[in-house]
Amino acid sequence: MSELTTIARPYAKAAFEFAVEHKAVDQWLGMLGFAAQVAENETIHNLVNGSVAAEELASIFVGICGEQLDEHGQNLIRVMAENGRLGVLPAVVAEFVAFKAELDKEVQADVISAIELTDQQKANIQASLEQRLARKVKLNCSMDASLMAGVLIKAGDLVIDGTVRGKLDRMADALQS
């Protein structure tokens, strides 16, 4: 997956910088999202990975996307087709979203708990993370009974393991060393 990210990042960065410069970040996000859905279509996926000439592939792709892509979006598709990179469009979108989140000072936080969290607990976790990270935090909450009790929080590079399972694992490691 990191190879896809490495390939996708320059395209996403170029598109994002262009979008910011032209105050069209949301429009570009929509265009790229639509193009990524087209790229994930099985028939198109087979064309992208087949032996179709880049120019012809770009024309087919742009034709399918129609008015969903403006002139600049079409140019990006053509460049990616010429370089044989249309298959990484979903990764380009993921990178673009990450750049947008950084611009908007937002971060996604995965909160995994042993039991269902109440709305108040979610609000407390969100407020604490926003204060600690100095960013707007969006929570993705899920449950995992194997944690026994407590909460595991992952936000970017930050991992907070307040679970009983995590504490037991750390104690076992300490006893073995």
UniProtKB/Swiss-Prot annotation:
The record's listing under SUPFAM superfamilies reads: N-terminal domain of the delta subunit of the F1F0-ATP synthase
Q: Which UniProt keywords apply?
A: ATP synthesis, Cell inner membrane, Cell membrane, CF(1), Hydrogen ion transport, Ion transport, Membrane, Transport
Q: Which domain of life is it from?
A: Bacteria
Protein localization: Cell inner membrane
Give the function comment from the record. F(1)F(0) ATP synthase produces ATP from ADP in the presence of a proton or sodium gradient. F-type ATPases consist of two structural domains, F(1) containing the extramembraneous catalytic core and F(0) containing the membrane proton channel, linked together by a central stalk and a peripheral stalk. During catalysis, ATP synthesis in the catalytic domain of F(1) is coupled via a rotary mechanism of the central stalk subunits to proton translocation.
- Family label: Belongs to the ATPase delta chain family.
The name this protein carries in UniProt is: ATP synthase subunit delta
- Protein source organism: Aeromonas hydrophila subsp. hydrophila (strain ATCC 7966 / DSM 30187 / BCRC 13018 / CCUG 14551 / JCM 1027 / KCTC 2358 / NCIMB 9240 / NCTC 8049)
